[in-house]
């Protein structure tokens, strides 16, 4: 055995000993309380037909053929970015291959040596990875803690200051106090970056637009693989920001651009979203019903979103509860440490427009049995 292979095995054995080894699981026929397909777009026949109709109008090659800076650019890609900028009320838009690529490209390039990034302690791993690749000094502030952020911003700095948050947090499901944060950023001349991944579609065009603070946010990131049922992401900001990222965001420069099917899927999903108010209201109704049914149980985190999490400390304990739920043909997955801090392991329930109240009742009956 090669030394490198043994090192891999030893590392995996250590993780197994910590009861935190991840595995790929397939539950094909279970009722979905797991996916990020909040509006059901990933299974929508209407969206499928829209995409097929648009594909039939184009004779371009299937793949993009290269980076956007080489052979991978197209009129469809440019038109999509113009459409997305208008849709999200932004000056400019730049499409990335995924939300991960968008955050890594953005955070690794936007801040230089001497700059500072203050970030909510619960921001996504992709933001952490981007910050690690930057030359900026990066400091967390306590989750949604305005006072702690104020203390951070009071620190003297020589360079540019950025503040990074999510509008809806992926593990806890709660909202960032965006208006308070944006007011602080304006006061301290800090640039606010908001990841809208789990708000897009669930709350219309995102919480930034819902709260009418687009002009106060320096950068927004929207992803298309969740409520929009597609793939890819967009970074929204000024024309200067877009030009900068085209020149310096390595995850944009050094990768093959999205294929035609993905570009068309993104636009069609947005057009479907504009006429899917009833579907969005059905999701919001399910969220309201779920919160009513768990009211008073302090093990559930307080969340106004489609993400509802119940703390079950211990990797083995949360696995056992999820196994019981899965045996009833309900797809709920455990969230283990180190993905979340030790002692904060949980079941993470994702609600959808297509879930029925009977399915929700069945899930909660098993959880409490």
Q: PLM features: residue spans?
A:
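PLP-dependent enzyme catalytic core of the Aspartate aminotransferase-like
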Residues: 41-49, 53, 82, 86, ...
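Conserved N-terminal alpha-helix of the aminotransferase class I/II PLP-enzyme fold
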Residues: 56-98, 287
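Active-site phosphate-binding strand-loop segment of PLP-dependent enzymes
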Residues: 139-194
